[in-house]
Structures are given as structure tokens and as C-alpha cells.
Amino acid sequence: MAEEKALNDQMLARRQKLATIVSDLHLDPFGKRFERTAKAQELHNLYDASSLEELENAKHEVVIAGRMVAKRGAGKVIFADFRDVSGKIQVYARRDDLADNYPIIKRADLGDFLGIKGIMMKTEAGELTVLATELTHLSKALRPMPDKFHGISDVETRYRKRYLDLIANEDSFKKFQERSHIISAIRAYMDRNDFLEVETPILQTEAGGAAARPFITHHNALNIDMYMRIATELYLKRLVVGGMERVYEIGRIFRNEGMDPKHNPEFTTMESYAAYMDFTDVMDETEGIFKAAASVVSDDLKITYQGTEIDLGTKFARKHLVDLIKEQTGIDFWQEMSVEEAQKLADDNHVKYEKYWGVGHIINAFFEEFVEDTLVQPTFVYGHPVEVSPLAKKNTDDPRFTDRFELFIMGSEYANAFTELNDPIDQRARFEAQAAERENGNDEAEGIDEDFIEALEYGMPPTGGLGVGIDRLVMLLTDSDTIRDVVLFPTMRPE
């Protein structure tokens, strides 16, 4: 209660100051357009190397704007720190220089926005500073800033009120800047390689392209239920059928599933499809994307994630899923076996399975149980069973497996790709098998998308497809241990 009263007292004091800005200073407390000549970091880049005497002689005039985050002094002289999107800069305000303008900064609270015109200088201590010659009040903050800018300790507040997190935590602010730059780097890589960026529907009549539970909504005008997309895959492939040989989309995906440190119900992916490529070509593409993204945060492409060094600059390893299982368990799934034999192996090794599973499902479960966590450095794992790859092309040498790969780093999957299934007859059979799984209790199995099958019947060239989880990639590159730290507004339970 005492803390709440103190907050209320501070808010009351700020509202009283708001009134005096109007009554005494005759200013609009919420300002108007303001034109600046430089940002804080630009000033540091230009003048940090200059001496006190050089700046004193040059008298460089600048105009800046930002939020006041620190204030020292209250009489005839005030030092204050102002932050903009690029960083912080100190301002030195003297009553004798500013005259009637001086009350603007004297009455300003932490969090207020001011515009400052001034001359570049350095203090005796060597700190780069703007000597204010004119002040403009731009906006009044009616609530006190969190924790005096020392951060927000309550993680719930950080996620629910991200604006406070961005104000208080410079590391968090920087992380989201890096996220934007990472996405830009991926876009630039795709554009350089002749991929066309496209947009596909978020509202769909069939939920396909992934094994996931969709969000369902209702379209009033059409009086039909629709699904929030769980993948962009099937529409992007339609575009390849239509002659767009290289396409990609960066966009939001929605899955009505659980939340944990690596999963949020809405998340961002990048999917791409390229005609006349196969999954080995897509490995090269994926490696290029990850190297481009890593260059945003590391010049040598080496990063540290949760204390472990990851080298994204080296050639990524390529290993078959069955070989990896054999390395870890001694079990050879290259041998053909019945479902009963696979179930016995699972029972003997304490691997759980569902009653509707085939041999391929059990092989995949062995991989998840015994191999995933061992894959620390970037590794392409290829050759997934047909049963868990309904949209991937069968391997010609062993049709039990597919020309599919996943990229693993630090025991987690970061990309999923395959040589796309372009045989409409085989695709229908796969969809029907998925529908049967749904009947047997797998509520994440896909249904039959008749329109997509029709599109394939018009002919789709051999195609390599890729999906990358952007949020998980940003987690890796910014050393974040939860997806909520890299999604600006994560899904939260209502308070």
C-alpha cells in the first residue's frame, strides 16, 4: 500500500507540473513536430575523439531530441542524460545561457521528452556533452519511470508491458534491434539469390502444411469456419506451380498448442521454395541464411549460447538420421522390420509410442530420445521416415525414408526442409494416411487439401523447400533462453 501511495503521489506531482507547463510556461505539454540534426550515437561517432580545446574552438551546433533518463543539479546548472533510439548523450544546461528557457529543464521529470539545440563540448572529465542554448518541451511523462532506469526485475511486467522493458533495459532494447537486423539480413540474402518475397493468406479454409492444432475462427459474411494458418507451405507451392520459380515469405504462424520457453502460440517463420533444387541444394541455402544472420551479431560468425561456443562460420555437418541413432544406441534401423519388432525395441529402450504409430514414427522417437540433445554444433540431419514427412519426396534408394533434413544446433531444431513431393497421386495417399491417423486419435494430423492436390495435378517442377523458425534463430544469436525475450508481445495469461 505504501508503494502504491508513493506512486500515486508521484503521479499527482507530475500532473501538477503538467498544469504549470500550460499556466506558467504557456507551452503545449505534449508538443509538436521537432526536427533534429543528429542522434546521440552519431555525435559520439563524430566527436568522441575530439579534444576539449578542439570542440571549444569549433563550436559545432547540433539539435537533438530524446527522453530524459538522468538529472543532476537543480539550481543554476543542470546536467542531464537524454536517450534516443541510438543511445545516450549528456546535456549541460545553465540558467544564464537559457534565461526564460531554463524552467523547461528545471521542471522536467525523468521520462519527459525535450528537444535541445546546443554546442558540442567536453567536460573537464572528458565526457562528450551538448551545451544547451535552446530547449523545447516535447512531451510530459505522467507516470514515473520504472526502477529509476535500473531495470525491471519482475519478468511478468517485462512481457506484459514491453514498453517499460524497452525504457528500462538497454539490453532488451538492443536485442529487438538485433532481431530486426537479423530479419533484414535474411531478406537481403534471399533477394540476392533471386527469391521473390510474397504474401499468402493468414485465414484459410484448410489447416495444412504442418502437423499442428489450429486456431479456429468464424467468417460471418461467408458463414464458414476458417483457420489461422499453421504454415505457409501449401500456398507457396501453389505459386511454384504457377511459375514463380523462387518464392519466400516471412510471416506469422498460429498454432493452438502449449507454451514453453521455446514455443509461443503465434510466431514468425521464413519459408522458401525453389524450382529445380533438391534438399541438398537447400542445405547450401540454409547454411547461407544462417551465416548471413550470424554476421549481424558476430564478425567471425562464432557465438556463445548459454555458455557454449557455436561456430556458424564452419561447414555444417551432414548426417543421416538412422546412422546417428546407431551411433548413440547401437540399434540399426536400416534393417527392415515389422511394427511389432519396432515396438519391442521401443519397449526394451523405454521409448514411448502411440498405438497408431508405424515403424517410421518409432524410428523418429528414437532419434528424439537419444540423438537430439547430442547435436551441439550445426548439423543437418537428413533421411526422416515417410510417416513423419507427409509433404516430402521419398528417397529413391530407400523409399521408407525421405529427402528431408532438419538443422540442429544445441539440441534444438532450427530449420526443416525437403525435396518437395510433387507427385499428386502420392500426395493424396499421404494425406489419406494422415486422415486415418486423425481418426485414430492424432489430432495434429493433416486433413486432405483437395485444392492443393488439384494444383499439383497441373504440374510442379522438382522443388526444394525450407522453413526456418525466426524466433528460435534470434534466441540463438542473442543468447536468449526463452522465446518471450525475443517476441515483443508474447502471449500471456490474462491478469
UniProtKB/Swiss-Prot annotation:
Origin species: Leuconostoc mesenteroides subsp. mesenteroides (strain ATCC 8293 / DSM 20343 / BCRC 11652 / CCM 1803 / JCM 6124 / NCDO 523 / NBRC 100496 / NCIMB 8023 / NCTC 12954 / NRRL B-1118 / 37Y)
Subcellular location: Cytoplasm
Name of the protein in question: Lysine--tRNA ligase
GO cellular component, one term: cytosol
Protein encoded by which gene: lysS
TM regions (residue ranges): none
EC number annotated for this UniProt entry: 6.1.1.6
Cofactor: Mg(2+)
Statement: the UniProt record of this protein carries the keyword Cytoplasm: yes
Keywords: Aminoacyl-tRNA synthetase, ATP-binding, Cytoplasm, Ligase, Magnesium, Metal-binding, Nucleotide-binding, Protein biosynthesis
Entry binding sites for Mg(2+) 1: 406, 413
NCBIfam families: lysS_bact, PRK00484.1
Major enzyme class: ligase
Domain of life: Bacteria
Keyword Magnesium: yes
Cofactor binding summary note: Binds 3 Mg(2+) ions per subunit.
GO molecular function (one): ATP binding
Quaternary organization: Homodimer.
Catalytic activity: tRNA(Lys) + L-lysine + ATP = L-lysyl-tRNA(Lys) + AMP + diphosphate
Chain sites annotated for binding Mg(2+) 2: 413
Protein family per UniProt: Belongs to the class-II aminoacyl-tRNA synthetase family.
GO biological process: lysyl-tRNA aminoacylation
